C-alpha cells in the first residue's frame, strides 16, 4: 500500500495537513494515520459538506459527540428503526449518523425501506480502525459492517494508531495510507515501572501523588479495580466501565460505577478498555490529571497495554483547552512481566489456522456422510465448538481481521517477556520520552503470593525451585550479597513444601528436580542416589581415611563393636549416613579375626 505523507505544523488541526495534499475533506479509499490523537478527524467529518456515516467502536464516544453537535443521529442498541427513518426523512442538507458496528445494519435496513442508497449517497468513516483487529477475539460483531464498508463508493478508515490489516479489499480497491507527520517534537514523558511487587508499587505511586487533585487509572479488570478501591481504602472515586460491569461492581459495594462519563470527575477515576480510545475527556475542572496505566499479568493477559496503540490512545483522551500544550501532569505505566509467556511466530500461527481448517473439513465430511440424524446432530454441535468458528465472519467466510488478531496478540505478548522488551517497544512507538524504572526484586511480593495461592504440592515445588534458582542467579551475578541471598531464602520458609524442596534443591539442583517433573517419588529416588554417591566419595576421601587410620592402633585385638562405633562417630561428624558393618572395617584395614573373642586385630591400613 502506498504511503503519502502530510506535514502538520505545531498548533494545526487535521484539515490543514489534508489541504497541503489538496484535500478539503478526508479523501476516499484511504487509511488515515493521524499519528497524534485529538487532531479533530471525527469533527472534520461531522463538519464536512457531505452525508456521513461514522462507525465508532463504543457508545461513550458517540454520546460525547452528541454533547458537542446537535445535528447528529446516534445509532446504538437503544436506538429504534423509527428514529433512524425519521432522521433520514429530515430536510437537512447534510446528514450525520454515528453508529456502533453492531447497529450499522439498522441504518442499512431503514435506508433500504426508504429507497435510499447509502453506498452512493453517504461517505463512510470507520473510526479507531485498529479496534477491528484488537477486539475481534472477544467481540466478533465489531467487524460486522466490514462488507458494507467496502461497498461504499466513498469511504476511509482513520486512527492515530492503525494496525496493519491483511484484508484483500484494501489492495483490490486501491487504498492508500495518508501518514500525518508533525514537524515538531511531539513526544510526551512517560515513566515505565516494571515490578514483581505490584500492589506495593501502586501504593508508592499513589502516595507520591497525594497532592494530586485528579488521578485517572486505566485498568481493564473490574474485579481488580474493586480490589484496589478496597485494599487502598479509596473513597473519592468513580469507575467507568460497561453497563454489565457497572452492575457487577455495584453488587460488590462499589457504588460509584457508571457506563457513561459523568462529570465532575472524582479525585480517583478508573477506566476500563471501552474508554481507552476515541472518547474526549474535556471537563476536568481546569485541573490536569495524573494518568496511571496498569498491567497485572497475575490477573489476566488482557491487562496488557500495547505501547503502539492503547498507551497512545489513553494519553490522548484528555483534550487541549485553549493554547495549553500539556493536557496532564504525569503519565505512568506500572506493569508486571512474564518471562515464560509463550510467543508464537507468524509461521506458527499459520500452521495453527491450517489445522483449524483441516479439523473443520474432517468433521464437515463426517457430517455430510452421516446416515443417522443423531450422528448429524452430534457432529453439528462439535462443529459449532471448533476454534475455526471464531475465525468466521457473518457470511461464513474466514475473517482476515480474526487472523490479524491472532498475530497482533503474539506481537504484544512479546513485549511483556521482559522489562527491556517493553521499554524498547515504547521507544519504537515514537510518541513517548520513556524513563524505565525497573524495580523487579529477586523475590517480590507477587512471587510470594503465587506460592501461597498454589494449592498442589507439586505446583509449590515448581515455584520454590524457580525462586531458589533465581536467588542463586542473582547472587552469582553479584546483584545480591550472601546475607541478602539468605534473607530471600528465609522469605520462602512459610511455604509448606519449602523444607523438603530446598533440601532436595541443595543436593541435586534445579535440573534434576525439573527432570523429575517435581514428583516426590522420583525426587526422593534421585536424592537417595545422590546421598549414596556423596557418602561413597566422602568415605573414600583422604580426610576420612586419615581420621580412621589415626583412630586405631595396629596389631592389637580390639572389640568389633568398639571399632564400628568409632567409625560411626567419624562418619556422623562428617555427615556420612552409611551404615558401618564388619565389611566396612575390612574395607579400611587388613584384619585378623580372633577365634575366642568378638574382636579384630588390625594388621595394616590399606591406603
What is the role of each PLM region?
Residues 35-47, 61-62, 85-88, 104-116, ...:
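SF2 helicase motor core recognition
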Residues 37, 41-79, 163-166, 221-223:
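Conserved Walker A/P-loop ATP-binding site and its immediately adjacent core
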Residues 45-48, 353-607:
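The feature captures the C-terminal accessory region of ATP-dependent helicases
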Residues 51-65, 98-100, 202-232:
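Conserved strand-helix element at the start of the C-terminal RecA-like helicase core
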Residues 71-109, 251-258:
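Inter-Walker segment of RecA-like/P-loop motor cores
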Residues 101-104, 112-149, 154:
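SF2 helicase catalytic motif II
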Residues 161-208:
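Interdomain hinge/linker at the junction between the two RecA-like core domains of SF2 helicases
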Residues 297-327:
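Conserved SF2 helicase motif VI
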Amino acid at each position: 500500500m502506498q504511503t503519502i505523507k502530510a506535514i502538520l505544523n505545531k498548533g494545526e488541526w487535521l484539515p490543514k495537513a489534508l489541504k497541503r495534499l489538496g484535500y478539503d475533506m478526508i479523501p476516499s479509499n484511504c487509511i488515515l494515520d493521524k499519528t497524534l490523537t485529538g487532531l479533530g478527524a471525527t469533527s472534520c467529518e461531522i463538519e464536512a459538506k457531505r452525508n456521513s456515516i461514522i462507525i465508532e467502536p463504543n457508545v461513550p464516544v458517540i454520546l460525547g459527540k452528541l454533547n458537542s453537535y446537535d445535528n447528529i443521529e446516534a445509532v446504538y442498541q437503544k436506538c429504534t428503526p423509527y428514529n433512524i427513518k425519521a432522521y433520514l426523512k429530515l430536510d437537512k442538507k447534510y446528514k450525520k449518523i454515528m453508529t456502533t458496528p453492531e447497529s450499522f445494519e439498522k441504518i442499512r435496513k431503514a435506508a433500504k425501506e426508504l429507497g435510499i442508497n447509502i453506498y452512493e449517497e453517504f461517505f463512510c468513516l470507520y473510526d479507531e480502525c485498529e479496534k477491528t483487529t484488537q477486539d475481534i477475539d472477544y467481540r466478533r460483531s465489531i467487524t460486522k459492517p466490514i462488507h458494507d464498508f467496502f461497498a461504499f463508493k466513498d469511504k476511509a478508515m482513520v486512527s492515530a494508531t492503525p494496525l496493519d490489516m491483511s484484508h484483500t479489499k484494501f489492495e483490490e480497491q486501491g487504498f492508500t495510507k495518508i501518514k500525518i507527520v508533525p514537524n515538531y517534537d511531539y513526544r510526551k514523558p512517560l515513566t515505565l515501572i516494571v515490578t514483581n511487587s505490584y500492589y506495593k508499587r501502586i501504593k508508592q505511586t499513589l502516595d507520591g501523588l497525594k497532592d494530586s487533585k485528579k488521578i485517572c487509572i486505566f485498568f481493564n479488570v473490574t474485579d481488580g479495580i474493586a480490589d484496589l478501591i478496597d485494599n487502598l481504602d479509596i473513597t473519592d472515586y468513580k469507575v467507568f466501565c460497561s453497563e454489565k460491569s457497572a452492575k457487577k461492581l455495584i453488587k460488590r459495594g462499589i457504588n460509584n460505577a457508571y457506563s457513561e462519563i459523568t462529570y465532575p470527575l472524582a479525585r480517583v477515576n478508573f477506566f476500563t478498555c471501552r474508554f481507552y480510545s476515541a472518547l474526549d475527556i474535556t471537563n476536568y475542572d481546569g485541573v490536569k490529571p495524573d494518568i496511571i496505566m496498569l498491567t497485572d499479568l497475575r490477573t489476566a493477559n488482557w491487562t496488557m497495554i500495547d505501547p503502539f496503540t492503547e498507551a497512545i490512545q489513553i494519553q490522548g483522551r484528555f483534550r487541549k483547552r485553549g493554547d495549553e500544550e500539556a493536557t496532564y501532569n504525569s503519565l505512568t505505566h506500572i506493569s508486571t512481566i512474564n518471562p515464560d509467556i509463550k510467543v508464537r511466530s507468524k509461521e506458527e500461527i499459520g500452521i495453527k489456522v491450517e489445522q483449524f481448517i483441516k479439523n473443520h473439513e474432517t468433521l464437515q465430511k463426517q457430517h455430510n456422510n452421516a446416515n443417522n440424524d443423531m450422528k448429524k446432530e452430534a457432529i453439528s454441535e462439535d462443529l459449532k465448538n471448533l476454534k475455526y468458528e471464531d475465525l468466521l465472519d457473518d457470511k461464513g467466510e474466514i475473517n482476515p481481521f480474526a487472523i490479524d488478531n491472532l498475530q497482533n496478540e503474539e506481537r504484544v505478548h512479546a513485549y511483556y517477556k521482559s522489562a527491556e522488551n517493553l521499554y524498547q517497544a515504547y521507544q519504537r512507538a515514537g510518541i513517548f520520552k520513556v524513563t524505565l524504572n525497573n524495580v523487579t526484586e529477586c523475590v517480590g511480593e507477587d512471587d510470594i503470593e503465587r506460592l501461597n495461592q498454589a494449592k498442589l504440592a507439586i505446583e509449590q515445588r515448581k515455584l520454590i525451585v524457580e525462586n531458589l534458582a533465581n536467588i542463586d542467579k542473582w547472587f552469582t551475578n553479584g546483584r545480591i550479597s550472601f546475607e541478602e541471598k539468605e534473607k530471600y531464602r528465609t522469605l520462602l520458609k512459610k511455604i509448606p513444601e519449602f523444607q523438603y524442596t530446598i533440601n532436595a534443591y541443595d543436593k541435586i539442583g534445579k535440573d534434576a528436580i525439573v527432570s523429575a517433573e517435581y514428583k516426590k517419588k522420583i525426587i526422593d529416588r534421585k536424592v537417595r542416589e545422590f546421598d549414596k554417591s556423596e557418602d561413597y566419595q566422602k568415605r573414600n576421601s583422604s580426610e576420612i581415611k586419615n581420621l580412621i587410620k589415626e583412630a586405631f592402633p595396629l596389631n592389637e585385638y580390639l572389640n568389633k563393636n568398639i571399632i564400628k562405633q568409632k567409625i560411626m562417630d567419624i562418619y556422623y561428624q562428617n555427615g556420612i549416613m552409611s551404615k558401618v558393618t564388619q565389611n566396612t572395617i575390612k574395607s579400611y584395614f587388613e584384619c585378623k579375626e580372633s577365634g575366642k573373642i568378638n574382636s579384630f586385630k588390625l594388621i595394616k591400613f590399606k591406603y
